[in-house]
Amino acid sequence: MTDRPFAALILAAGKGTRMKSDLHKVLHPIAGKPMLGHLIAAVDRLGAARKLVVTGAGREQVEAFVAPLGVEVATQEPQLGTAHAVQQGEAALADFDGDVLILYGDVPLVPAETIRRMLDRLQGEDAPVAVVLGFRPDDALAYGRILARGDGAIDDMVEYKDATTEQRAIDLCNSGLMAVRGRDLWRLLAQVGNDNAAGEYYLPDIVRIARAEGGRSVVVEAEAWEVAGVNSRAELAAVEAEWQRRRRLAAMADGATLIAPETVWFSHDTMVGRDVVIEPHVVFGPGVTIEDGVAIHGFSHVEGATVRTGAEIGPYARLRPGADIGEGAKIGNFVEVKNGRFGKGAKANHLSYIGDADVGAKANIGAGTITCNYDGFLKYRTVIGEGAFIGSNSALVAPVTIGDGAIVGAGSTVTRDVEADALAVARGKQESRTGWAARFREAMKIKKAARK
């Protein structure tokens, strides 16, 4: 359905004092993306015609974040309640001929599908003025209550502070999220007063005003997790945990095996293929694609990387941005790859740093190999050819190219290109002195005894 255009109006004017942070509350991340970013992504998926954020304290941070996202900004100063906050969008949206969706920047998990249900209900045959998103929490706490009939029609909405004992016994609570016909919203807001316990202008009052005019408002219900809000670090952690729990379930439903799901942490954009096995304590940062049949062993950290079909990562491996691990390749324990490409079947099994490098198919990188890619000012690239073998404890000083099939002897420091199928050995000549160690020990014993 959702035929009429809609504008998303996101409220983000709160001071967020309980977060005790210099970062604006709505910019704190869930799964690596700011909370506000999750909401913008959701309404973008539904094709929002306009997007507007109402902010107050710390607005410069919010403005900087939304500037490249096609989002307009309005300011609420001072903060006089939710109805007053929505009113700050009138100047931008007064001529908008569509519906207005009201969201909260600190309620980041509401799915696009739930938003669609709200907008579709607003276009129902009974033509409601407003659709309110309600939920039934395990503990209603101090949420506002929705007084609704069996068909979802709302008789009244009341803030907890102003509710009677009987009203507080109702378990249908107001999430604050609402969809309103734009042609009615501003007129209704103009009639909202502040004769209540807090002296604020409450958005839910428009439901009562519309009903007095003969208009109808209805409730659509959501699961409690969808409308969980964040006002403290503890609540931020709880919302993160819920997001991760659901993402893990989705990964397993799509054909991945998570040995200990509760220990795997995804980013908002992690892509995981089928028949992937992820062992305990794996962390995915942003920008990761894991193709089919990959094994990621425990305690590995992957960000900004692509791992191709059948590759094996870890344990204790780190893939940094720009890492591209080829089909059937192996990145082993305590190996770090940054901006490095590994060809099909290439291996770096132990204790290596491979940065700004191209590693050819079937190449074998020995333990302790370091690509020396930085001189303190600029980065340089290392190219290792197909089938090359790099001996243990080697340093490859970039820019340098190791040809196809070449062998670098263990312990070498390579500063010049090595041609294909050549052997390069770059280390000091070994010297052995017969009996020297025994003579040294005896001399040192005498010296030590003389000091007593």
Swiss-Prot record:
GO process terms (BP): cell morphogenesis; cell wall organization; lipid A biosynthetic process; peptidoglycan biosynthetic process; regulation of cell shape; UDP-N-acetylglucosamine biosynthetic process
Keywords: Acyltransferase, Cell shape, Cell wall biogenesis/degradation, Cytoplasm, Magnesium, Metal-binding, Multifunctional enzyme, Nucleotidyltransferase, Peptidoglycan synthesis, Repeat, Transferase
GO molecular function: glucosamine-1-phosphate N-acetyltransferase activity; magnesium ion binding; UDP-N-acetylglucosamine diphosphorylase activity
EC number: 2.7.7.23, 2.3.1.157
Cofactor binding remark: Binds 1 Mg(2+) ion per subunit.
Binding-site residues, Mg(2+): 106, 231
Cofactor(s) the record lists: Mg(2+)
Region (Linker): 234-254
Alphabetized SUPFAM superfamilies for the sequence: Nucleotide-diphospho-sugar transferases, Trimeric LpxA-like enzymes
Cell compartments where the protein resides: Cytoplasm
Region (N-acetyltransferase), start-end ranges: 255-452
Residue positions of the active site: 350
Source organism, top-level taxon: Bacteria
GO CC list: cytoplasm; membrane
PROSITE patterns membership: HEXAPEP_TRANSFERASES (PS00101)
Record's catalysed reaction(s): alpha-D-glucosamine 1-phosphate + acetyl-CoA = N-acetyl-alpha-D-glucosamine 1-phosphate + CoA + H(+); N-acetyl-alpha-D-glucosamine 1-phosphate + UTP + H(+) = UDP-N-acetyl-alpha-D-glucosamine + diphosphate
Transmembrane residue ranges: none
Residues binding acetyl-CoA, per UniProt: 367, 373-374, 392, 410, 427
Protein family membership: In the N-terminal section; belongs to the N-acetylglucosamine-1-phosphate uridyltransferase family.
Quaternary data: Homotrimer.
Name of this protein: Bifunctional protein GlmU
Taxonomic classification: Bacteria, Pseudomonadati, Pseudomonadota, Alphaproteobacteria, Sphingomonadales
Name of the coding gene: glmU
